[in-house]
Design a protein with these regions (language model features):
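Membrane-interface helix-capping segments at transmembrane helix termini in multi-pass transporters
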Residues: 11-22, 48-60, 71-102, 142-149
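Interhelical loop/hinge segments that connect adjacent transmembrane helices in multipass membrane
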Residues: 119, 146-153, 162-205, 220
Length: 251
């Protein structure tokens, strides 16, 4: 409600569309690098949260698996930069937005949800979003600041993941890890089972932007993004506002 009207006025439809088009492509790469790991990892961490040794081992194994998949993801980013003409129009922006893949890998949001440390997650999210909004108003002043807007798009959502990763030292114990006993790929098969559901959801949410970007241009994606946000905001307001029946019942 606050940032999008400002950003759309500065970036215009083609600037907003360019960022959203690239983000949609990267979201598919990120989908494959995550491979259902976040939802799977929440369950696995929750099962052993009272056992520091097992929790440390499982967390490190999942992080190693995610690191390997992230490496494959950046190989895909390199191939796209070399072969896709529409991405080659602004490779620096595409590479900047691809930082989403890295931040997702180190985010460990699943760990804090598994141990039910929701207070930290809420406070961290509020602080990071507040800082990112302030930086948006300070740094994005003209259409030429599209890289700053791209940085805001990444940091506003995933910047707090750096703090997540650093804070892991509070819970994980190096002396409990035997690296020879780690089996990161043992988590691959169960995570894939969740991956199929994530693919269906992602296709529904992101495919329109990708297809529109390839079939038309960034400006078309920008107008479509604005229309979608207006629709989502309207639906949210309708569902959160009290109905006449609820108002009558309360009286």
């Amino acid at each position: 409600l606050i940032t999008f009207p400002y950003a759309s006025r500065i970036m215009m439809a083609d600037g907003i569309g360019q960022v959203n088009f690239f983000q949609s492509i990267i979201s598919y790469i990120s989908l494959f690098t995550c491979l259902g790991i976040p939802m799977y990892a929440i369950r696995e961490v929750a099962k052993v949260r009272d056992n520091p040794e097992k929790m440390t081992r499982i967390t490190v194994e999942i992080l190693l698996l995610h690191a390997f998949l992230t490496l494959l993801g950046y190989m895909a980013v390199a191939v796209i930069c070399l072969t896709v003409t529409k991405v080659q129009t602004d490779i620096p922006l595409f590479l900047l937005l691809s930082a989403t893949i890295f931040f997702t890998a180190i985010g460990c949001e699943w760990f804090y949800q598994g141990i039910e440390d929701f207070k930290y997650v809420a406070i961290r999210g509020m602080v990071v979003k507040t800082i990112s909004v302030i930086l948006l108003f300070l740094l994005v002043k003209s259409k030429e600041d599209i890289l700053w807007y791209g940085a805001y798009s990444v940091l506003g959502v995933l910047g707090g993941n750096i703090f997540n990763f650093v804070r892991l030292r509070k819970y994980l114990h190096k002396d409990m890890i035997e690296f020879r006993a780690l089996h990161p790929f043992s988590h691959l098969k169960p995570a894939i089972h969740i991956f199929a559901f994530n693919v269906i959801v992602s296709i529904y949410l992101q495919l329109n932007n990708v297809l529109l970007g390839f079939m038309k241009d960034a400006e078309a994606v920008g107008y479509f993004t604005a229309a979608t946000k207006i629709l989502v905001i309207t639906i949210c307001l309708l569902y959160t506002s009290p109905s006449p029946r609820d108002y009558a019942a309360s009286r």
